[in-house]
Amino acid sequence: MPGAGARAEEGGGGGEGAAQGAAAEPGAGPAREPARLCGYLQKLSGKGPLRGYRSRWFVFDARRCYLYYFKSPQDALPLGHLDIADACFSYQGPDEAAEPGTEPPAHFQVHSAGAVTVLKAPNRQLMTYWLQELQQKRWEYCNSLDMVKWDSRTSPTPGDFPKGLVARDNTDLIYPHPNASAEKARNVLAVETVPGELVGEQAANQPAPGHPNSINFYSLKQWGNELKNSMSSFRPGRGHNDSRRTVFYTNEEWELLDPTPKDLEESIVQEEKKKLTPEGNKGVTGSGFPFDFGRNPYKGKRPLKDIIGSYKNRHSSGDPSSEGTSGSGSVSIRKPASEMQLQVQSQQEELEQLKKDLSSQKELVRLLQQTVRSSQYDKYFTSSRLCEGVPKDTLELLHQKDDQILGLTSQLERFSLEKESLQQEVRTLKSKVGELNEQLGMLMETIQAKDEVIIKLSEGEGNGPPPTVAPSSPSVVPVARDQLELDRLKDNLQGYKTQNKFLNKEILELSALRRNAERRERDLMAKYSSLEAKLCQIESKYLILLQEMKTPVCSEDQGPTREVIAQLLEDALQVESQEQPEQAFVKPHLVSEYDIYGFRTVPEDDEEEKLVAKVRALDLKTLYLTENQEVSTGVKWENYFASTVNREMMCSPELKNLIRAGIPHEHRSKVWKWCVDRHTRKFKDNTEPGHFQTLLQKALEKQNPASKQIELDLLRTLPNNKHYSCPTSEGIQKLRNVLLAFSWRNPDIGYCQGLNRLVAVALLYLEQEDAFWCLVTIVEVFMPRDYYTKTLLGSQVDQRVFRDLMSEKLPRLHGHFEQYKVDYTLITFNWFLVVFVDSVVSDILFKIWDSFLYEGPKVIFRFALALFKYKEEEILKLQDSMSIFKYLRYFTRTILDARKLISISFGDLNPFPLRQIRNRRAYHLEKVRLELTELEAIREDFLRERDTSPDKGELVSDEEEDT
């Protein structure tokens, strides 16, 4: 594939082979991430004389298929972006007038969003590399739109699929790959290129490639700022100073003087005289013009010449001619002639470039002078006291005359410029005529020399060997010239071949992508038509049911009502089946059998429970679609990741608020991994690379006391999740590996029931090693010591802290529980131990985990209180302990609105200081330790008394008693 050197394939193991691979290669590191497409390019920007190429740092974002550009690699916010998904590319062919051996142009065009952006690479090879890489990225992104399911809840952003077990679901394609022939043709048309030093992340450490116009842009910008500052002094109401003047420096010593009041009076008098003979002096402009352009012999050195002179001195410092006035010419003699010729050629090119820049600057000066003339003249005619008392028609006539004068002046200047250009063209043509005459003379001499050689050969035939032509003969010149022309034509031919290959590949790709887009549109139309038909069918059935409900009910005759209800129930309990995926668009289902996390949405056994679960799933779907219509959260995440394209993620209030609102499904793997790495960086720095593989190898070689309990709990972890439902599931093997590795890392805990559920949730979005470090984060960083030990000391302490917080934040509900003697910590104990796994619906569970992995265990207290506050009124209506306790066992599954729950957790419960939780933990820790010590003493006394009791005897059988 083109540009394969810049991309690395993602590795990833799955199933049982992953464990064996990790065991066989304990030193193997994690899979390498694909290399980013980034580097320096020059972008054509600006307007007018300031238009030119500016060096920019470009970074490709595969999530949105955007090509962002920055001023430098260190910038956090991009200057803009190009949408590559709907872009097409082109570049110009070789220049036929170019000299043979010269470097062809390396600029190309990106046509996107109705605009054309011109980019320039340092050389032709890098231009080809960028074009093929951008083509490849566009191809992968657009084809990935076909590789995901149409349900938006199961469709991560193309190019940014999550990792972990949920990533495996994205490989279930609705369509087979439709572009096999197009892919084969693309490979044939591809041109192998190798990235240079200015591509890739290593290019950020190198200086940006410069271009000769950089100093001119800077000088023009500075010059424009000075002009703007000088113009700001032209405000009415200020006193006139005759010595004040505005000077424009060009290559000629022109000076722009402000008009004095005397000049204005003279101009008004002259205009009044011209009113009598308006046609008399139509072409005369000098007498009435309020500005004086004159030579200023006393002016010092001009700033523009200083800039150009310093630029020449910097670039011609190696010129030997600048050293030779002292009489020692040894330096220039020692230099080779080729080097001297190259220097002279480069200086000539710089001189031509400077001449072009000088002409553009002169044009800018002319436009600015004309603008200043017009503005100042209008100012004096509108605000000057000299115009007081002058009739209105006279002033209008003066304005008309002034406009005529300005127009004639502009026309005169334009004609002058045209005259200069024509004169320059005449001079160029004369020089070309001279060159052609020289070539004609040389050809005549060559023909004459050939005639002489032919005559000599004919005269001396048979008398001896033919005379050889000297190498310096004029006949060699046409041969060399023909050879150069042949080389140039060969270069052009090769360039046209490459361009033809590229354009053919571009046309092929655009045609294939267009066909894919048309097919997606047809499928979506079919899906929406089917949904509309199903909606009409359901509405019809409900209208029939409502009509039947109006009729009197007969106890003996069931009537058609029961049949309609039975049919509606049967239709409602249907779920999406994966046996016939080709009919997914023909018969769409609103609720699938599994959600995006792999949890079963509808149970298999109880029909009544199935109906309740189906209603809950439909409510969740409705909430999700409603939230999706408000795209503010998704847009905020996209904007945040756009600002981090050029830098690493960092903790900030903005990121905290985004995570609290919930991480989108397509970004959760990336953000979770970043959170885990941030909390475990100190552990990883103190361990050898491949720490997880080493522990896993040890667990496979040696027997661990915890391994038996781990095996017993594997299938009991998340039986309602398809990734852990059977022994052959991929998640079971990964879960075993992580738990065994952790049991060897932390022998004090080994294994505790509850750790398996923590790892199972982490594995849904993380790979094995990252899930291992996630467990380390929870057990060794977030939770207090002895949280998962045999005594569960830390867990018991947190329940007492939570009881204190309940009495403070929810006093009515706490008093209600105390009144009916309901110990709600029996319910909340499991919430804290496994961080709400199997306690809330999956959408809310993962939003809780988002904040938990970023902020720590304080989030558990927030959400536990928020769950009770969410249903506070319903709980207060219950008036007996049995109904309260029964409601507490399932009420969390009835909470579906994650946005409301998050608002309660991080809004209504504030303030929520972490220091308060730490102080109460320390207070209750001593009390619980004292109670456990007393219980242990009582237990030891009981065992001691039982062992030393004289009444203790050996048990005998009934037969022995009979005998």
Curated annotation (Swiss-Prot):
Region annotated Disordered, chain positions: 1-30, 272-348
Any one of the GO CC terms: cytosol
UniProt xrefs under InterPro entries: PH-like_dom_sf (IPR011993), PH_domain (IPR001849), Rab-GAP-TBC_dom (IPR000195), Rab-GAP_TBC_sf (IPR035969), Rab_GAP_TBC_domain (IPR050302)
Entry's Gene Ontology molecular function annotations: GTPase activator activity
Keyword Coiled coil: yes
Example GO biological process: endocytosis
Keyword Phosphoprotein among record annotations: yes
Main location: other
Superkingdom of origin: Eukaryota
Domain Rab-GAP TBC, first and last residues per copy: 662-856
Entry-linked CDD domains: PH_TBC1D2A
Residue ranges with Low complexity bias: 19-30, 318-348
Implicated disorder: Neurodevelopmental disorder with seizures and gingival overgrowth: An autosomal recessive disorder with variable clinical manifestations including delayed development, hypotonia, seizures, gingival hypertrophy associated with a prominent mandible or cherubism in the first years of life. Some patients have early normal development followed by developmental regression. Additional variable features are coarse facial features, optic atrophy, sensorineural hearing loss, and ataxia. Brain imaging may show cerebellar or cerebral atrophy and enlarged ventricles.
Protein name: TBC1 domain family member 2B
The organism of origin for this protein: Homo sapiens
Organism phylogeny: Eukaryota, Metazoa, Chordata, Craniata, Vertebrata
Gene name, Swiss-Prot/TrEMBL: TBC1D2B
